[in-house]
Amino acid sequence: MEKPSAPHLPEDNRLPLKVNESEHIAESGESTVWKMGIQDSLGNEQHIALKQNRREAFASDEEMQKSKEFYEFLKSFPGFGKFVPETLYFKARVAEGDTPQAFAIQSLLEGRTLDEIPDEELYRDPEVVKQLIEFAHAAIDILQQTRRAGTLKPDFGVAGTASEEAQRQGNTFGNSRFTTNVLVSDAPDEHGQRVFFIDTGVNADERVNKTRQVVERQVMGRLREFNFNRWIKKLEARLK
């Protein structure tokens, strides 16, 4: 059977970007992630990650504001914000006549997500291990805070494009060691950061389903917290 072709952006797209090249790199639910080379206002090429949310309801002014507010919550949360890359939100039509959709832009980070990195490679660099410990502590704090407040939490799950084992570990057993939403960059940024939480949006199903929100906070959130604590002990043992 012939493998279906990957999605592609039309050359005459209506995005407010001067796109030199684009490559489809991930798919999860109603979201698509593109790797792009774009030309800025000075004529310089920049490489970005563009996340497209195809659910029309999320492109309303109200929902766009909620997306920005959730990003600002993550960015300003003590201990967690340092892991969140700068993100720009906007809405646009992909092609003439299309319904507007919601988009988010981040500078492209070269690296791999946790589900793609085996233990021995992930734990090889002590600085990465230290940052993972910091991240896990911050993730526990934000899970506890959102549970107390009854508000939306970050998505520490695994996308459907990951391996079956990563999905089983991350989505069934709540083990965020395998999340597709944390990336370890190949090289540190100007602040020495290598660990990044790259999905600054709310899980789409949680966003529209109040019952799912409660279950995720009270059940899966607690399970993720338990697994984060176990992971911290494992990471700390690597530094001894």
Model-identified regions with their sequence ranges:
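Juxta-kinase regulatory segment immediately upstream of eukaryotic protein kinase catalytic domains
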Residues: 1-23
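ATP-binding glycine-rich loop module of kinase domains
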Residues: 21-23, 27-74
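Short, solvent-exposed loop/turn segments that connect beta-strands within catalytic domains
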Residues: 39-46, 80, 94-100, 186-194
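A conserved alpha-helical element in kinase catalytic cores
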Residues: 53-92, 127, 211, 217, ...
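Conserved structural core of kinase catalytic domains
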Residues: 82-136
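Conserved kinase catalytic-core helix
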Residues: 112-195
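Activation of the activation-loop gatekeeper triad in protein kinase-fold domains
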Residues: 198-204
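Catalytic-core segments of enzymes that bind and process phosphorylated/nucleotide-bearing substrates
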Residues: 206-238
